[in-house]
């Protein structure tokens, strides 16, 4: 497998591919279960879609129960990205109490979610169709505004 070097995006895509290969699923809920992350639906404030929490060797993904199914799946994928890429980062603390920008972490978690929900084999099924990458993203639970995070370097002529 050759992965064009796009810095952290290459590493994120490779991490997602390893997870999918190891557990034979790209379902974020199943993956969370396999790696001992508790997924908890909760009635959160409408501005909070979800969060990842690491506490005393226990891992939790909390998802706003008021979201629709596609949104919940994306949020689970995004938070799974935090669990895999930044397992002990306390982003709420960093955002509130430090000058450290957590934007990089959020983009990386979004990239993880996009690669998980839009693996190359899914995107390649739409080759030679009228569907755009944004269309394919939305059909697979990825917000259109994040479709640009998909690494298409291994897909020829898409």
Swiss-Prot record:
State the superkingdom: Viruses
InterPro entries annotated for this entry?
A: IrrE_HExxH, Rad_response_metalloprotease
* Annotated Pfam families: Peptidase_M78
Q: What is this protein called?
A: Uncharacterized immunity region protein 2
Taxonomy of the source species: Viruses, Duplodnaviria, Heunggongvirae, Uroviricota, Caudoviricetes
């Amino acid at each position: 497998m050759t992965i064009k070097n796009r810095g952290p995006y290459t590493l994120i895509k490779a991490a997602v591919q390893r997870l999918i290969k190891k557990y034979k699923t790209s379902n974020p809920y199943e993956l969370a279960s396999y790696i001992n992350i508790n997924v908890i639906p909760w009635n959160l404030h409408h501005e909070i879609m979800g969060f990842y929490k690491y506490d005393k060797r226990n891992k939790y993904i909390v998802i706003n129960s008021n979201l629709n199914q596609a949104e919940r799946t994306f949020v689970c994928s995004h938070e799974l990205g935090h669990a895999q890429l930044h397992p002990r980062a306390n982003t709420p603390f960093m955002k509130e109490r430090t000058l450290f920008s957590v934007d990089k972490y959020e983009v990386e978690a979004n990239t993880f979610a996009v690669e998980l929900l839009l693996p190359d084999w899914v995107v390649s099924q739409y080759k030679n169709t009228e569907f755009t990458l944004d269309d394919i993203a939305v059909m697979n639970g990825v917000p259109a505004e994040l479709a640009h995070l998909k690494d298409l370097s291994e897909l020829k002529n898409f």
